[in-house]
Amino acid sequence: MDPINGSHSGANATISDITNGAYNATDAGEWTSSVMFKLRTCVLLLIVIMAVLGNMLVIVSVMRHRKLRVITNYFVVSLAFADILVAMVVMPFNFSVQFNQGWVFGETICDLWNSSDVYFTSTSILHLCCISVDRYYAIVKPLKYPIKMTKKMAFVMLAATWLSPITISYVPIFMGWYTTTDFLESRRDDQCEFKVNKPYAVISSSISFWIPCTIMIFTYLAIFKEANRQEKALHARAGNAMLMHRHSREVSDKNGALHINATTPTKDRNLLKMKREHKAARTLGIIMGAFILCWLPFFLYYVSTSLCDSCNCPEVVTVIMFWTGYFNSALNPIIYAYFNRDFRNAFKNTLACAFCSFCKRSASDLDAMERLDRRGSAQLRVPIPSRRASDLASL
């Protein structure tokens, strides 16, 4: 065997193996990338659909059930409406960026998207802040609650909740106050970055998250402290009532007299009301905690990258933090259904009615089609005997 030819053939085989290995690695990488892209698309679509349908269920259930039409749920319904707008206005643009791997809507829509993102995030946390204040008066200061938390006051708070975030979203972003001059001059139509200056980062994050979050934490600490005190007093009162009842029974047995121990309806109503307020506070406290857990990573990232010029974050981490915050809009209806019996029963009833009405409509459509078929077949059969009768008559 020629050593030169042998070395050439060995080299060719080695090159062929390397080339095939590179092609296989490329195919495997493309397959993995394709699978991850499809999986990510499905997850993001699921979040959008859950947010829209779940919060629509909340709104319809409160409207249909009189038991849920209390002042606290005015804020819950308004929060659900804000979450629906997040799912319909904000999430689709972010989904488009992930799907198209770029921005295709131009500068104006980019500003609109960034403004809406800031606006609805601020609106959501201000709703939770209003709910915490409502629960604070209901549990810590129950005598002042009917005076302070009227329907008029609730509508004033809701108006402030919807109007005040405009000052840190649409106005500064469309006026160009939120960023630097260099960034405005170097903007491109195929990119939608939200690069903010340091004053705007501090002011917007404080109004949107840090100040309301601090208020909520302190109000809920006071709420749970008062709730624990009331429960301890309730258990002590129940224990004393049991001792008094036992003592009165012993005395009545000795005297041979009949003793009836009955609680007053007013005490029963107050007890049920207190338990209901505590359950509502627990559910809304869980909602507040879920909101903080979902949005805290993003705001830490937002402030740190805005104040630190050399701090960078991988794009995949940024996407995860954005969609973790968006997921909170889909999470609230699940929390209502799991932790609050009134909402759970209302959801079941609303879904059952929707399903029954759909079934009835489908059945009525089928009946109508059957009637049309019978009428059509009858019309087809009528001329035949009539024609035969006329023929016989002519004969």
Curated annotation (Swiss-Prot):
Glycans are attached at residues 5, 12, 24, 114. Its main location: membrane. The chain crosses the membrane at residues 43-63, 75-95, 118-140, 155-175, 203-223, 283-303, 316-336. GO terms for biological process: adenylate cyclase-activating adrenergic receptor signaling pathway; adenylate cyclase-activating G protein-coupled receptor signaling pathway; cellular response to amine stimulus; octopamine signaling pathway; positive regulation of MAPK cascade; tyramine signaling pathway. InterPro entries: GPCR_Rhodpsn, GPCR_Rhodpsn_7TM. One of its GO terms (cellular component) is membrane. Pfam families: 7tm_1. The keyword Transmembrane applies. It is found in: Cell membrane. SMART domains: 7TM_GPCR_Srsx. Keywords: Cell membrane, G-protein coupled receptor, Glycoprotein, Membrane, Receptor, Transducer, Transmembrane, Transmembrane helix. Residues 1-42, 96-117, 176-202, 304-315 are extracellular. It is a multi-pass membrane protein. Coiled coil: none annotated. GO terms for molecular function: octopamine receptor activity; tyramine receptor activity. PROSITE patterns: G_PROTEIN_RECEP_F1_1, G_PROTEIN_RECEP_F1_2. Signal peptide: none annotated. Residues 64-74, 141-154, 224-282, 337-395 are cytoplasmic. Autoreceptor for octopamine, which is a neurotransmitter, neurohormone, and neuromodulator in invertebrates. Also acts as a receptor for tyramine, but with much less potency. The activity of this receptor is mediated by G proteins which activate adenylyl cyclase. Belongs to the G-protein coupled receptor 1 family. This is Octopamine receptor beta-2R. It comes from Chilo suppressalis.
